[in-house]
Amino acid sequence: SLKEIIEALPYQPPFLFVDALEEITENGSKGYYQLKKDEYFYQGHFPNNPITPGVILIEIMAQIGLVCYGIYLAKEKLKDQEALLVPIFTSAAVDFLGPVYPEDQLEVTSEKIYYRFNKLKCLVTCKNILTNQLICKGVFSGMIVNKDKIDQ
């Protein structure tokens, strides 16, 4: 289920950026995150004029559009090895098109480019629901690897 996918994410607050998943299919995913006005990164970026850092937007897009989607696609492997598998983010090329502020509501949509040999590549877009503005878009890649291979 979509709730189980969120529960399988290897993140915890304050670094969990998935509020809800609306849908995941073989071709893509859609999910949401609302930025809270007291997010830890607004204290320094920027005082008295908080703007969401681009690296946080990339992380939101990666968690919803790549990791949640990758967990769905790798569900057969996860049944047997859930504790042993971890997502590895390998690359992103992102265009930023507008600022994001505290309390903005983001919709992240992912479209599969390919998934093979545990590597997933997607076109991911992020839209501000409140303004209906496309905020950023990019191509993201990642893979599911066995934790034992990372520890070496």
Q: Where do the language-model regions lie?
A:
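Short, residue-level hotspots on alpha-helical faces of the histone-fold
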Residues: 59, 63-67
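Hydrophobic beta-sheet segments that form the core/acyl-binding groove
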Residues: 21, 90-130
